[in-house]
């Protein structure tokens, strides 16, 4: 059985979130939370919040044991891009892309054996 949680349109670039997400893939949830608490990246608290939501979903909706949960899948997709303009020299302007992320965390119970 799997439980998942998704955070959509988070205002952090997907490339930066993937650096954090790669640290917790395949880890037990307690270990994953400890790693996120000690990772000095802007995306860490956001990923931790999604992970805790997935854990709560597993416990409440599927009655899984929290102590046996493992981060089975975690991935980041690109959300809608906010386009802004920065004034440049000689009356020009250049485009700035403020990227957003969709963060998905899937937890499941660890197989015995």
Curated annotation (Swiss-Prot):
SUPFAM superfamilies: Ribosomal protein L22 (SSF54843). Gene3D superfamilies: Ribosomal protein L22/L17 (3.90.470.10). PROSITE patterns: RIBOSOMAL_L22. CDD domains: Ribosomal_L22 (cd00336). InterPro entries: Ribosomal_uL22 (IPR001063), Ribosomal_uL22_bac/chlpt-type (IPR005727), Ribosomal_uL22_bac/org-type (IPR047867), Ribosomal_uL22_CS (IPR018260), Ribosomal_uL22_sf (IPR036394). One of its GO terms (biological process) is translation. One of its GO terms (molecular function) is structural constituent of ribosome. It comes from the Bacteria. Pfam families: Ribosomal_L22. Keywords: Ribonucleoprotein, Ribosomal protein, RNA-binding, rRNA-binding. GO terms for cellular component: cytosolic large ribosomal subunit. PANTHER family: CHLOROPLAST 50S RIBOSOMAL PROTEIN L22-RELATED, LARGE RIBOSOMAL SUBUNIT PROTEIN UL22M. NCBIfam families: rplV_bact (TIGR01044). Belongs to the universal ribosomal protein uL22 family. Part of the 50S ribosomal subunit. This protein binds specifically to 23S rRNA; its binding is stimulated by other ribosomal proteins, e.g. L4, L17, and L20. It is important during the early stages of 50S assembly. It makes multiple contacts with different domains of the 23S rRNA in the assembled 50S subunit and ribosome. The globular domain of the protein is located near the polypeptide exit tunnel on the outside of the subunit, while an extended beta-hairpin is found that lines the wall of the exit tunnel in the center of the 70S ribosome. HAMAP family: Ribosomal_uL22_B. This is Large ribosomal subunit protein uL22. It comes from Bacillus anthracis. The gene is rplV.
């Amino acid at each position: 059985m799997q439980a998942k949680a998704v955070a959509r349109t988070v205002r952090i670039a997907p490339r930066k979130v993937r650096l954090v997400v790669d640290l917790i893939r395949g880890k037990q949830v307690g270990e994953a939370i400890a790693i996120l608490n000690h990772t000095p990246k802007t995306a860490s608290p956001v990923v931790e919040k999604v992970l805790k939501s997935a854990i709560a979903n597993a416990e409440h909706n599927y009655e899984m044991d929290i102590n046996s949960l493992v981060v089975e899948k975690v991935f980041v997709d690109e959300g809608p891009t906010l386009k802004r303009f920065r004034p440049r020299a000689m009356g020009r302007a250049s485009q700035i892309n403020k990227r957003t992320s969709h963060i998905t965390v899937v937890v499941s119970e660890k197989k015995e054996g």
